[in-house]
Amino acid sequence: LATDESLLADGLYFISYFDRNNIALDNKGNVRWYTVKSMPSNNLLRLANGHFVSSAVAQSGYLKMYEFDMVGRVHAMYDLDNACHHSLYQQSSTYAYKGVNNCLVAASEYMPGSRPDGGLSIEDGVSIINLETGEEIDYYDMVQVLGLSRATRPSNPPDTANGTLDWLHINQAYINETNNMLITSGRNQSAVFGLKVGTYDLSFIMGTHGDWPEELSRYLLTPLRADGTPYDLTDPIQAQEADAVFWNWGQHNVLEIPNATPGIIDISLFNNSNYRSRSDANSVLPQDNESRIGHYRINLNTMTVQMLAEYTSGAEGYSSLCGCKQEMPNGNIVVSFGGALFDSNGLPLTCDPGYSDVALEPGNGDVEGRLPLREMNAEGVILQDMTISSGLYRNIGNIPPSQTGFYRYNITCFRMYKLPLFG
């Protein structure tokens, strides 16, 4: 725990455990607030009016979204046409989408069997929702943007029962208001990409250049080193270096760093860092890996991207499936490595061996979920470091057959913020 609380940002740590509870901890780790199981806990977001909004799998498979306040009063319930399965983002009050203010941007998907093209792809859409009426103003089907030909990296285990295809796995979307551009993060393509709002016109793709269809290659951003010189990606050594130390892999929580300059988009992201390569031979194993926080600047005029800053976690913070961070008004950074897994000897593990990382683990078969939570200053000095664990080691040998596919998912945190008790 922090030795000098005066260095910490104000507020409580609000943590949303996937399909468990939302809780708030003070700087000593004491629980100061929580919601009961009947309230959704997954993609918790505090709105400008001080209320929270969230959807979860327990609430009709993400098809019911609740707006509730700090004392548990439900102010609105949204019956959704498309499931809002990952991050939610409220645009500023001055931004109007097709003449509508107070809009929510949500990672979403067509319900099974309802795709207009009859396809089986999932978690590959973005919904724009009017928070005043609950109406879905627009839906972006990203199959029409990126296609389905590129292999996933990382991925989820195949859905053998239903045959669905989680080829993109959108986990965050928001509108960059300066450039009127929809920014979207796709975990299973390790890509962040931008569309002109209201269209399917692609503007850029941020991610490793390997294996993209030729027709999309002109949208790939060129990576720049800290001194402004570009990586030469025709050189295999430099391309491998960029994969290992520069590019985003399995990223989450892609959010804007304010910059009002037209043609410039600054973002921060939680770089899970799965694999760090499109080839197994060059991939980093979970026990040698770490998740990172990256701050990047995208220049749409030069089609380049440069890393402005990076914060690393060490092996104790490697999270193969989720994670989030927040920049505080005092310059501190709060981060949750929300999908960290370890065996009983402390060896970092991955959530889905062979899919989320290379299937090579020398562990003892035990798995415990842990949620390392940190607050750092702007220089990366750790001021607060606490870990919440499931308190339970699972082993595939003592798990019922019906649960073997998910036995590693015993505690995860998709969203965490440091906020005042009342907004």
Enumerate the predicted regions with their spans.
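Histidine-/acidic-rich catalytic cores in large beta-rich domains
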Residues: 1-423
